[in-house]
Amino acid sequence: MMKNKKALIGIILFIVLIIAIIVIKYLTDNDKGDILTGKLTTVYVATGGGKEDFLNDEDVNKILRKKYKINAVFDTWSNGKTITKPLIRESVGLGSQNIINRMSSGEEFTILSVGVSKYDALFTSDQRFYDYYKLSPNKEAGESDRYTVLDGGLTLNTPIVIYSWKEVVDALINESIVTETDGVYYITDMNKLIDYILEGKKWSDIGLGSLYGNINIASTDPVSSSPGATYYGLLLSILSGGQVTFDNIENNLPKLKDFYIKSGYMNNTPADLFERYLKTGMGGEPMIVDYEKSMIDFANSSPDAFNQVKDDIRILYPTPTIWNSHCFTVFTDKGAKLYEALNDKEIGQIAWEKYGFRTGVTGGTYDVSSIGLGVPQTITSTVTSLKMDTYNRLIEYLK
């Protein structure tokens, strides 16, 4: 009996030891121990879309934890709501459940209210929202109170490009619309391409009899989609000769509205449009607007699928193009610490190599040749991002 009791105790102790080893290993490997013991600084960030995979990347977060002792919490926000809703965690169903319930009952809260869960930083996915947040809120338009901005800037960048196919690009080269330089394809006459679309030219008019219908570049809807708005901002800049002014915007909006109408059906998200481009091929989507990062992300996440289509794919760089810049806005010292960390060279390399973001980090070495497609080392021909009021006028006119 005593022998059995000792054996049972031994088994229990052995099991407890195994569990303890597993727990210790888990905490060590995942840096959870540092979080639980307070060795990591938790930083809360209101975050726009388009960079979720990068922010969740295991290697990125390991650098943040190991090198900078940061546990970053990125809450998902739409860009527009960062202006109109109180920038507190409770606005997106996080933080204090008591305050969430009271907000649901109609009670109003702001960043100045007692007990709310505040943010250390804002990470928008569009520069116009970064620039606009730094201004005083327009209370008459229903804008919410804002944090004091301590620092910030452009952190992740990717240019607008047009994805197409070999046969289409060959035809555009013959039309003197596209030029190839060192294996990179540039749309050197965007005005001519815009005119072709406005004139209703057909694909068959440029020697592509296998394609049905009029020449078109598919995009997301600028009225409801930030990428679509960025693209139409580029078109407006091109039509305005590179400099949008109060006078020429009114002259060019009717032409842009005509372009918008002729574009027909539009996808809701760039991810849906890019997937359709890949799945339906040249017959379904001869040309689409997207970000440069999408193809690099696809090449890394789905190498087998990428290898099947890469010989037929062409990336066209409009000259000029426009940057889509994800901007980091610092509200607190903790936010400043994360901002510094995101400018780390190693994190910058991951941002480019795995997700296609250009960070502009000094010392960053981008091996564009490794992608196997025509991607330029640097992009110099760009237009300035439009201000919020210009975008608002553009979008209102298109509705």
Regions from the PLM with identified roles:
Residues G153-I162, L253-S263, N268, F306-K334:
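Periplasmic-binding protein-like
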Residues T230-R314:
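Ligand-binding pocket segment of bilobal, Venus flytrap-like solute-binding proteins
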Residues M2-K25, F331-K399:
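Extracellular/periplasmic juxtamembrane helices and adjacent flexible linkers that interface
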